[in-house]
């Protein structure tokens, strides 16, 4: 065999240089949690020479801050508001995928025996909310619909866990939560819903986001991730009890509550388009109007990654 032929054989036998993709997720990142548990994403990425490390965050905003500073490459689903806050802070992001609207998967809760009967009754009340979360916009939208502004309440910016603790101990008058926290609290405490996002109030899409640099460099990996997320979303809807059993152990919530929470989510993963970002602009403008974002944000002025064949 010639030296050239031997060199070719050695080159073909040499394994691809391994690269790690750092994936951030939060408790409500259902599809990512399932993929982390079953190992299917690692298997699918292995032929590309890619390994995966997983990093959990309390909510979406810290996750995207980690992407912005280069600590994470890809962020599992975050609420629609989160990329807007990150964009306002100058983050270089790329939309990778979206989950179709799930308006009933977030809501404003009050204790079952609360004298608060409507959103209008929240005037002067203390409300727990996670800053920059989708529920933050739901609160703004619900207040506006009732003739109130954000300045008419006293916000308590808390993580989901701290928000729930404050809620059950009656340290706040209301709590704006999303699933699975929402359903779990409602079932355990009998909390009442003042408003969810239905009837056009807040669509509550969820987005998968990568750093713009990673999207430019590893579109092949994003294609694999996109396809696996779409497959897993379909599986969850087709197998609600099996999905609930897996997630119950991960979330520390009983399977019946998980199944109910999952029924509120679409888990319909698709490509992000400019027309599909129309509500993002409405959300951004609402936060600017309340002085919660310092300057106008053009929500289409961001990279949109497109899956192969879209």
Descriptions of predicted regions:
Residues 2-11:
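Bacterial N-terminal signal peptides
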Residues 285-310:
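Conserved C-terminal helix/tail region of periplasmic/extracytoplasmic solute-binding proteins
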Residues 42-50, 199, 268-276:
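Short, solvent-exposed loop/beta-turn-alpha elements that line the ligand-binding surface or hinge
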Residues 216-292:
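Secondary-structure end/capping motifs
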Residues 19-149, 155-157, 173-179, 202:
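Short, glycine-/small- and polar/acidic-enriched structural segments
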Residues 12-18:
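Sec/Tat signal peptide C-region and signal peptidase I cleavage site
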Residues 81, 155-156, 160-249:
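Pocket-lining segment of extracytoplasmic ligand-binding domains
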Residues 32, 102-108, 191-192, 204-213, ...:
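Small-molecule pocket liners
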């Amino acid at each position: 065999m010639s030296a050239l032929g031997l060199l070719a054989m050695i080159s073909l036998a040499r394994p691809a240089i391994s690269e790690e993709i750092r994936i951030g997720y939060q408790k409500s990142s259902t599809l990512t949690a399932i993929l982390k548990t079953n190992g299917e994403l690692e298997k699918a990425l292995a032929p590309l020479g890619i390994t995966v490390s997983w990093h959990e965050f309390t909510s979406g905003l810290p996750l995207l801050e980690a992407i912005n500073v280069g600590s994470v490459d890809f962020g599992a689903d975050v609420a629609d508001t989160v990329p807007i806050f990150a964009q306002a802070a100058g983050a270089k992001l790329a939309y990778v995928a979206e989950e179709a609207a799930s308006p009933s998967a977030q809501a404003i809760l009050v204790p079952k025996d609360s004298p608060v009967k409507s959103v209008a009754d929240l005037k002067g009340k203390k409300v727990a909310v996670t800053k920059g979360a989708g529920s933050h916009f739901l609160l703004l939208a619900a207040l506006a619909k009732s003739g109130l502004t954000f300045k008419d309440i006293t916000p308590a910016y808390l993580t989901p866990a701290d928000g729930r603790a404050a809620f059950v101990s009656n340290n706040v008058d209301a709590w704006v939560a999303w699933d699975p926290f929402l359903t779990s609290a409602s079932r355990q405490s009998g909390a009442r819903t003042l408003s969810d996002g239905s009837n056009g109030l807040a669509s509550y899409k969820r987005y998968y986001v990568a750093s713009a640099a990673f999207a430019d460099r590893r579109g092949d990996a994003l294609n694999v991730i996109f396809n696996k997320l779409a497959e897993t979303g379909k599986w969850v809807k087709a197998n609600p009890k099996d999905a609930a059993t897996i997630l119950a152990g991960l979330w520390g919530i009983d399977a019946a509550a998980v199944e109910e929470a999952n029924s509120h989510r679409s888990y319909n993963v698709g490509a992000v388009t400019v027309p599909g970002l129309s509500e993002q602009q409405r959300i951004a403008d609402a936060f600017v109007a309340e002085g919660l974002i310092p300057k106008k944000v053009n929500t289409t002025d961001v990279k949109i990654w497109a899956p192969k064949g879209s």
